[in-house]
């Protein structure tokens, strides 16, 4: 068991090294898009399933509260938090529509959808992306593996941040780091006077 634990750390480190080579430009582009969205008076909606739902909530919490510097709250909504809404939609319609119906109600042109799926094939995330596109929103997708069906929905104005791994746990670990990079870039761009040395 000790060897398995050490292997998990080693694999996680290697995946992050690979991601450090592959992802910085797309992370920077996504952060710039988010900054422009927020400066334009818009908001960022986020969604995911399971651990990715936790990541969506984590991102939203960092924007609504703060990341590492003191600053005003920034508008973000995690679509995985309202159990009454989610269960009503799943019961009356379909689990695949739990995020898309919220996007049709809350999403506005100029908003961003942060869509998170390690496989890129989650049905409700695909529907969420389709809803966002119909609302003239921009999409930032956090994926892994081969990008799945989500990769095929991306337009030139969207950004896919695809973790170079086929292991769900490693993808999730890098997704969290990507989220922290996005939050850091947003904060440091919007509030440069608060930047620490």
Curated annotation (Swiss-Prot):
CDD domains, per the entry: SIS_GmhA
Compartments, record wording: Cytoplasm
GO molecular function: carbohydrate derivative binding; D-sedoheptulose 7-phosphate isomerase activity; zinc ion binding
Ranges where the SIS domain occurs: 34-196
Positions with a binding annotation for substrate: 49-51, 62, 91-92, 117-119, 122, 172
Entry-linked InterPro entries: GmhA/DiaA (IPR035461), Phosphoheptose_Isoase (IPR004515), SIS_dom (IPR001347), SIS_dom_sf (IPR046348), SIS_GmhA/DiaA_subfam (IPR050099)
Source domain of life: Bacteria
Catalysed reactions, semicolon-separated: 2 D-sedoheptulose 7-phosphate = D-glycero-alpha-D-manno-heptose 7-phosphate + D-glycero-beta-D-manno-heptose 7-phosphate
Pathway linked to the protein: Carbohydrate biosynthesis; D-glycero-D-manno-heptose 7-phosphate biosynthesis; D-glycero-alpha-D-manno-heptose 7-phosphate and D-glycero-beta-D-manno-heptose 7-phosphate from sedoheptulose 7-phosphate: step 1/1
Pfam families referenced in this protein's UniProt entry, alphabetically: SIS_2
UniProt keyword Zinc present: yes
EC nos: 5.3.1.28
Binding site for Zn(2+): 58, 62, 172, 180
Cofactor binding note of this UniProt entry: Binds 1 zinc ion per subunit.
Function statement: Catalyzes the isomerization of sedoheptulose 7-phosphate in D-glycero-D-manno-heptose 7-phosphate.
HAMAP family per UniProt: GmhA (MF_00067)
Protein family: Belongs to the SIS family. GmhA subfamily.
Record NCBIfam families: PRK13936.1
Record-linked PANTHER family: DNAA INITIATOR-ASSOCIATING PROTEIN DIAA, SEDOHEPTULOSE 7-PHOSPHATE ISOMERASE / DNAA INITIATOR-ASSOCIATING FACTOR FOR REPLICATION INITIATION
Listed name of the protein: Phosphoheptose isomerase
Organism of origin: Shewanella frigidimarina (strain NCIMB 400)
Lineage of the organism: Bacteria, Pseudomonadati, Pseudomonadota, Gammaproteobacteria, Alteromonadales
